[in-house]
């Protein structure tokens, strides 16, 4: 991983930092080299084409990734493990293409006015026969490039609990290009130059029952599995950043 970073990533840092963009051809080059090196989808199970590395191993890799621009290392590719909840045709339509790099996904949770506070979420989906009708918006949804689909979290009802009503959150697989689904690039990142954010809006988007990821109402549980480990990887990235800047300071 260190050799890959020094050869394929570090040489492009100055350009990305000054220009604020990662040209698509450069991103695809990094993606291709990552696949050849066996780094792409290293976090996913071997039986579906991933690297099958342990969480500890991935954390060590993330520490190395943290030594460079997020905009560059995100092209190496680490599909969200939430997609492991795919079943039936979802596996061939979403999971496997993400593992091979044919498709890219977005994790769409944060909203205007609510941020990542899921209990403040306003995006909602109501039943219409066997289908769902999705409405709402998401922002600050990040990724290296325009995605092929988004994993969208929306309120699908209320559950009575001992602490009072609790929003029932469900995850949906929503393809870019679906009628009523609009996506555009959002605000530029100050510290993550070249890393894209997207704004998503949903206006009466009709989704079939096969576009529910996992079970209706278990969106929070799905999100928690990924976010919990993701926080560890963020910490590993931060350690890598600190390690590199100390090294650069010593050299200077």
Where are the regions a protein language model picked out?
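Glycine-rich beta->alpha junctions and the first turn(s) of the following alpha-helix
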Residues: 182-252
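A structural signal for short hydrophobic beta-strand segments in well-ordered beta-sheet cores
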Residues: 123-126
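A short, Trp-centered hydrophobic/proline-enriched beta-strand micro-motif
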Residues: 101-109, 153
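C-terminal helix-coil-helix/basic helical segment that borders enzyme active sites and/or dimer interfaces
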Residues: 13-21, 250-251
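Structural signature of FAD isoalloxazine-binding scaffolds in flavoprotein oxidoreductases
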Residues: 52-64, 117-121, 201, 207
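Short Gly/Pro-enriched turn/cap motifs at secondary-structure boundaries
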Residues: 98, 113-116, 140-143, 162-163, ...
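A short core secondary-structure module
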Residues: 135-183
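Internal helix-loop-helix
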Residues: 31, 35-102, 142-149
